[in-house]
């Protein structure tokens, strides 16, 4: 499971000119599910994201987590995070999870975050989405549950 995590002041995802999800201060997460992913990946990544200390404390040091600040989460599915661009000029997506399995894992990830008490909004799985991100910092991190990077 891979994630692009961005600290945001606000973020909105729109599908067919209708807002599907919108948050204030928190994290915008583009989430990709891989073929080999399972519940262990959900546990690892959800815990890592909710507890990353990337929000500033009173001294301006990145020392607070999403949970610490009562921040919100916007999760958008993004299978292209598993795009392999090493050969040729067109990415290959062989390592991306099959849609029916990926959707289930994506939904379980979202539910895990909600169960932790985080207000969590989402896009629509497999939809063509427009994502507006007001990146704060900017702070952007790449995470991989298999720790490939």
From Swiss-Prot:
InterPro entries with a match to the protein in the record: Daa-tRNA_deacyls_DTD, DTD-like_sf
GO CC entries: cytoplasm
Enzyme Commission number, as recorded: 3.1.1.96
Principal place of residence: cytoplasm
Record-linked Pfam families: Tyr_Deacylase (PF02580)
Record's subcellular location: Cytoplasm
Reaction equation(s) it catalyzes: glycyl-tRNA(Ala) + H2O = tRNA(Ala) + glycine + H(+); a D-aminoacyl-tRNA + H2O = a tRNA + a D-alpha-amino acid + H(+)
An annotated Gene Ontology molecular function: Gly-tRNA(Ala) deacylase activity
Keywords assigned by UniProt, alphabetized: Cytoplasm, Hydrolase, RNA-binding, tRNA-binding
Enzyme class: hydrolase
Presence of the UniProt keyword RNA-binding in the record: yes
Stored SUPFAM superfamilies: DTD-like (SSF69500)
Gene3D superfamilies xref list: D-tyrosyl-tRNA(Tyr) deacylase
Motif (Gly-cisPro motif, important for rejection of L-amino acids): 137-138
Assembly and oligomerization: Homodimer.
NCBIfam families reported in the protein's UniProt record: D-aminoacyl-tRNA deacylase
Domain notes: A Gly-cisPro motif from one monomer fits into the active site of the other monomer to allow specific chiral rejection of L-amino acids.
Function: An aminoacyl-tRNA editing enzyme that deacylates mischarged D-aminoacyl-tRNAs. Also deacylates mischarged glycyl-tRNA(Ala), protecting cells against glycine mischarging by AlaRS. Acts via tRNA-based rather than protein-based catalysis; rejects L-amino acids rather than detecting D-amino acids in the active site. By recycling D-aminoacyl-tRNA to D-amino acids and free tRNA molecules, this enzyme counteracts the toxicity associated with the formation of D-aminoacyl-tRNA entities in vivo and helps enforce protein L-homochirality.
Family of the protein in this entry: Belongs to the DTD family.
Name this polypeptide is given: D-aminoacyl-tRNA deacylase
